Amino acid sequence: MKPKMKYSTNKISTAKWKNTASKALCFKLGKSQQKAKEVCPMYFMKLRSGLMIKKEACYFRRETTKRPSLKTGRKHKRHLVLAACQQQSTVECFAFGISGVQKYTRALHDSSITGISPITEYLASLSTYNDQSITFALEDESYEIYVEDLKKDEKKDKVLLSYYESQHPSNESGDGVDGKMLMVTLSPTKDFWLHANNKEHSVELHKCEKPLPDQAFFVLHNMHSNCVSFECKTDPGVFIGVKDNHLALIKVDSSENLCTENILFKLSET
């Protein structure tokens, strides 16, 4: 005869079960949750000639949110965490009078140029102080540069200007970013850049690969009447100018001659 086995079943009352479930629920909701949010405040600085510089300094704000418990109520805590700040500088060309110029604001992290990173790029037509257009023509498998009068219905050639921060300190004759002068490269077509030939005192179009040579960089000066001038990086005091309806390198002896018409140029979106 088999012995009888007794089993006991502990019953949990409805009220007690609800209390247990509440405790478990409180434990789950008590866990913290972290979310990262990027914050990018913008700063503006107006330079002497009217050139407006916009800087954007980004950091991440990590928000720690503690979920509310049923007993203590809602608790909320925030703290800031600085992380991998990346600064972006954008040049607004109000000084040139070309605020409508098509602007490329894509991030340019081109580290191929030693110690220099491009700030931004603009696509614009280039003309002289007397409103003659700078044009480019392909002749015998090479590009020629002309200075000529165009008819009203003729389309102007465009040049891609890439802006860089130079190592030269800014002064009263020009504007800069963070105390440094701006440099530009000028490219009318892919893989071709304006190049200063100091030996021949000429301006030529050369096909170059990055890193670009120093002869392709020009220090930018903002002059009166919404004009700019381009000084050779490799030969200070020598500027891009106009001579016999062609671009040439012109020596400027003193700062008083920086306003000479044959070294002044205008930038326009049309």
Swiss-Prot record:
Post-translational modification, as annotated: The full-length protein can be released from cells and is able to signal via the IL1RL1/ST2 receptor. However, proteolytic processing by CELA1, CSTG/cathepsin G and ELANE/neutrophil elastase produces C-terminal peptides that are more active than the unprocessed full length protein. May also be proteolytically processed by calpains. Proteolytic cleavage mediated by apoptotic caspases including CASP3 and CASP7 results in IL33 inactivation.
Region called Homeodomain-like HTH domain, residue ranges: 1-65
Repeat keyword on record: no
UniProt propeptide residues: 1-94
Induction, as annotated: By infection with the parasite H.polygyrus.
Residue numbers marked as site, Cleavage: F94, A95, I98, S99, L108, H109
Gene Ontology BP term (one): gene expression
Pfam families: IL33_bt (PF15095)
Tree of life domain: Eukaryota
Keywords: Chromosome, Cytokine, Cytoplasm, Cytoplasmic vesicle, Nucleus, Secreted, Transcription
Family as reported in the entry's similarity comment: Belongs to the IL-1 family. Highly divergent.
Subunit structure: Forms a 1:1:1 heterotrimeric complex with its primary high-affinity receptor IL1RL1 and the coreceptor IL1RAP. Interacts with cargo receptor TMED10; the interaction mediates the translocation from the cytoplasm into the ERGIC (endoplasmic reticulum-Golgi intermediate compartment) and thereby secretion. (Microbial infection) Interacts (in reduced form) with H.polygyrus ARI.
Function of the molecule: Cytokine that binds to and signals through the IL1RL1/ST2 receptor which in turn activates NF-kappa-B and MAPK signaling pathways in target cells. Involved in the maturation of Th2 cells inducing the secretion of T-helper type 2-associated cytokines. Also involved in activation of mast cells, basophils, eosinophils and natural killer cells. Acts as an enhancer of polarization of alternatively activated macrophages. Acts as a chemoattractant for Th2 cells, and may function as an 'alarmin', that amplifies immune responses during tissue injury.
Domain description: The homeodomain-like HTH domain mediates nuclear localization and heterochromatin association.
Protein name: Interleukin-33
Organism of origin: Homo sapiens
